[in-house]
Amino acid sequence: MQAVEFCENPQGIRLRIFLQPKASRDQIVGLHDNELKIAITAPPIDGQANAHLLKYLSKLFKVPKSSIVLEKGELQRHKQIFVPEPKLIPKEIEVLG
């Protein structure tokens, strides 16, 4: 599976993410072992990193935070996330798809 997969049914984007918590700023770093590496500022304590990641992705894709689904990796750095019907696709992600 690729880092970014465009889905037809249901329509959306499935992302395989390698998460780097406690970074100096929120950013898409690039590819890391066939996953999209994303750095976020939140610590990996009590789900703070997951919540911050979903909030960051909702801003990037211009979708409600509640619509983004964390499919795999709730307690790991390796995650699989589904973003339904994104209004905007960031150029860093579009070139990978």
UniProtKB/Swiss-Prot annotation:
Pfam families: DUF167 (PF02594). It comes from the Bacteria. Gene3D superfamilies: YggU-like. GO terms for cellular component: cytoplasm. SMART domains: DUF167. Transmembrane segments: none annotated. Belongs to the UPF0235 family. This is UPF0235 protein HAPS_1504. It comes from Glaesserella parasuis serovar 5 (strain SH0165) (Haemophilus parasuis).
